[in-house]
């Protein structure tokens, strides 16, 4: 993991090196609510269990679930890495002084600690609260039925995904996107860029 983390000898505590970085002022929930305004949303519906019905109501489907499951794992199951989270509320104003701290120590079972209030940069009413919410992120082995978070980047899974990618290339009304649909690691900015590029291509 240390190969993915920036090492700095400055007071810059950013994880990324991008010139422009930000978080929606009212949070991601409010942003997504505005994006979905006027759009019918169905919660707790498994597309794969209702695909025939749902395919009838759309000219194009954007599928962001696991691509192998879309095809009933006809070539075999892709592997994933998973995570588990533990969240605690501490009666202190500041727990760690930063939004995210990554830990690469082999003796520590979690990989990062997230103190959520520090994402509210400059919002004194939040930062000065007398308690704080902290989440510990642990790596977890993945098995069927678990939440898949990351693709496994090795030769075996790469070759297996290529079979699914070639099969997906023959689809006329399905677009596969995201980490699971394209079976590749994507940061948020990469995901947004890919979605914008895909939308522009579809609207040409």
What is each residue range found by the language model?
Residues 21-28, 102-106, 184-191:
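Aromatic-acidic/polar surface patches that form glycan- and anion
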Residues 45-167:
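Mid-domain catalytic core of redox enzymes
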Residues 1-60, 64, 71:
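Active-site/ligand-binding neighborhood in enzyme catalytic cores
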Residues 3-6, 132-136, 171:
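Short hydrophobic/aromatic-rich motifs at helix boundaries and adjacent loops
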Residues 147-204:
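C-terminal catalytic lobe of FAD-dependent flavoproteins
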Residues 30-33, 37, 72, 193-200, ...:
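A broad, structural surface signal
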Residues 30, 68, 181-184:
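Short, flexible micro-motifs
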